């Protein structure tokens, strides 16, 4: 079957749309709350942020810690996507599955006043409180996407079709998405499945590598090259280079891995 990735503004009713599609297709439904919990648990198991004497909490979302956690979150998202028959309702998943033939990325929006009204009814709060909370959620989501992907909330490259729950009924949106997903299902081939599995593998390697304190995680570049993976970046020395290559190859297993890691210590000696 297919993969559905839903990007939405806060308070649009995307949650209800996702659940209705889950009930129809029998897909596994995975929201941001579950993904964050799984990413945090995976981070703990891999000793993220406490490796090599680092004592930062995984709840401190700043600098390298944020990027390391995002790498872990991306890995969790792609592991679920690689299983297929899944609905992902989380920020950024559209970017991660873009270009996968059997993946459908959609965007759900609504006017601010409509979203405020929905939030008031759902949470039982007054208009001003609802307005402040909805706008705060918009800012936080937009900021997170800019940091993680260099893109904003409404980037048209991140979705195939856009819906407005302020003007379109939920049933209408659900019916359109049903038809699109059934069309996407026909595009699932062994090659398409291999592509999403390779992306999941790349994300898993990246999540493991960036926890290494000797690695400048902001320099990390990984890409699929044919049947293999290319890893580029800057490390602080030969010891870290060997350690990172060892960890990456352990995860890649039989998949060919090319490591192109530049040592800072070597460059300093040359200069």
Where are these regions (language model features)?
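Residue-level preference for the first positions of well-ordered beta-strands
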Residues: 1-5, 85-87, 228
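Hydrophobic/aromatic beta-strand patches that form the interior of the parallel beta-sheet core
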Residues: 4, 30, 87, 104-106, ...
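Glycine-rich phosphate-binding P-loop
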Residues: 4-21
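A short beta-strand-loop structural module common to alpha/beta enzyme folds
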Residues: 27-37
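ATP-dependent small-molecule kinase phosphotransfer cores
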Residues: 35-88, 125
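RNA pseudouridine synthases
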Residues: 80-110, 114, 118-120
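N-terminal targeting leaders
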Residues: 99, 110-113, 117-121, 138, ...
């Amino acid at each position: 079957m297919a993969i559905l990735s839903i990007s939405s503004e806060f308070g649009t009713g995307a949650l209800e749309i996702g659940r209705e599609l889950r009930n129809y297709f029998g897909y596994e439904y995975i929201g941001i709350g579950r993904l964050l919990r799984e990413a945090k648990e995976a981070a703990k198991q891999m000793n993220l942020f406490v490796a090599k004497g680092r004592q930062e909490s995984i709840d401190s979302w700043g600098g390298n810690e944020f990027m390391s956690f995002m790498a872990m979150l991306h890995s969790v998202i792609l592991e679920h996507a690689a299983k297929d028959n899944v609905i992902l309702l989380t920020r950024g998943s559209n970017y991660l599955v873009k270009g996968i033939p059997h993946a459908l990325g959609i965007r759900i929006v609504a006017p601010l006043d409509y979203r405020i009204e929905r939030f008031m009814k759902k949470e039982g709060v007054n208009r001003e409180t609802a307005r402040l909370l909805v706008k705060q959620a918009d800012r936080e989501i937009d900021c997170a996407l800019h940091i993680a992907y260099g893109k904003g909330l409404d980037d048209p490259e991140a979705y195939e079709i856009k819906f407005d729950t302020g003007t379109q009924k939920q049933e209408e949106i659900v019916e359109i998405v049903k038809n699109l997903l059934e069309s996407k299902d026909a595009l699932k081939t062994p090659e398409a499945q291999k592509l999403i599995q390779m992306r999941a593998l790349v994300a898993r390697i990246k999540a493991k590598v960036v926890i290494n304190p000797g690695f400048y995680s902001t320099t990390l570049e990984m890409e699929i090259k044919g049947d293999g993976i290319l890893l580029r970046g800057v490390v602080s020395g030969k010891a870290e280079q060997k350690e990172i290559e060892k960890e990456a190859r352990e995860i890649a297993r039989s998949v060919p891995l090319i490591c192109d890691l530049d040592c800072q210590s070597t460059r300093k000696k040359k200069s």
